[in-house]
Amino acid sequence: MNANNSYLNLKINKLDFKITKAVIKESLDQIFLCECEGFYENINNDIFSDDNIEFDPNMLIDKEASLIIKNPYENKKIDFSTNIDMIYKGIISYVEYLGVNQGSVSNIVKENFKQLNHKHFFKFNLHSPLIRLDFNKANRIYTHTNIIEAIKQTLAYYNTKLNKNIDFSNIHHIYETKELISQYNESDLEFITRLAHNHGIYFYEDKDNIYFYDFYTHKGKTKDIVFNPNINNHLNEACIYALNKEKQIQTNAFTHSSNNSKQPLSLYSLSTKAQNTNTHYNEHYYESEYSFTQNINLKQSPTLKEKRNSMLNNTLKAKSNIYHLSLNESIKINIQKETTKEYTIIAKEQILIDDAILANTINTNDNLNIKDLNLSKSYTNNLTLIPSFLTFTPSFKSKPKPPINTMGMVIGEDSNIENQRNTIYTDEYGRVKVRINLYANQEELDNKTNMYHHSPFLRVASNVASNHSGFYHTPRIGDEVIISFLDDDIDKPFISGSLYNGVN
């Protein structure tokens, strides 16, 4: 590969930057980030003149960009099946201008350059376009829908900003309808990540699509990878050259005296060491027949925690020089002649260096020989693998902490409160419909004030609620009510009281 031809290029608008160093981090647990440094050659020394306004960081930030990785090896005969280009498409989330360096005259003569170019050096962060969902926090409420539809509705706000297809074709499970799904003081990215991960759904992207999975199904041909632990791989054989296993101490079961809050598995008796079916997971349950509502608990289930624990126990770390491996891809590793195991890539960190293209960029007053600069061209990656018989289970996300109390207004069947004021409107269980003040901005911005799916039916607390006895009152349309949250859960609001005001 010619010293002046980089195997790394970053294209922003119509500008083509040569990249000298890049670190790319991607995982099924979080969106990808690429931190890179490179330069753009320009005949002008002052790149920020009026004639070069396109180089101003203000013109580069938040622009779509593509990082293109070509085969990094001199030996093109290495069988990568095809010498494909790996492309990462995202947006520029950070720009820093590092300065200008003029090429060495002596080296320019050797390279037969006909004109004097100036290298203007920049530092960039290339982020997944999903980072645009993380810029602002929002309060929203969804009723009578499931988590998949809530995710789709949230993503629909960004139809013109993602510029990638959203693919839900790998969602195989059926998700029950929730009476209430709340987003409180969360960015849209935090919200869809919490909903997805707490239900065992993960998402990732390639250059054209964003994929959602809840069950891994392999597509395409499985790549056969050689395991070669020899550090003297002078021919740059495409291989995995290191495999490591990590393990940290943790409790593996419940007992009556202690439990592991991070990884609850099956419940065991302290004395018998056998599963005790009479012992229950330490969490409150509210059955629908008693609470007049479907299960609105959006916390992760012990089953998912068990799946994640099993996945973590079978995770492997690997190092390779194979540049064309993709996230969520299945590979077969030939550890020995008769031993082949299949794995799925769940995380990848790539370190790419190509400062050999700077060979003609030295200060002529340094009297330093080019061969002493230790310039290099290299590629390596760190992989996280799980056996292919396991499905990736993402880490769990905690819910936002709700306010202690908030206000709300009882409303009726439509938005005309004045005509219905002081009348009673309930559902079949005696619950009243409330417009919660937390979500008033959502209704105003969406221009859907008092719409049904923004105003849930809530239960009303009472001093005494016994069989055939107790206190009972029903807040009327137009009443101001106090909203509290059961178990400090944003998805479990109820009416804890009412307030007099100037109207009533």
Regions picked out by a protein language model, each given a short descriptive name:
Residues M1-N504:
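Amphipathic alpha-helical and helix-coil boundary elements used as assembly
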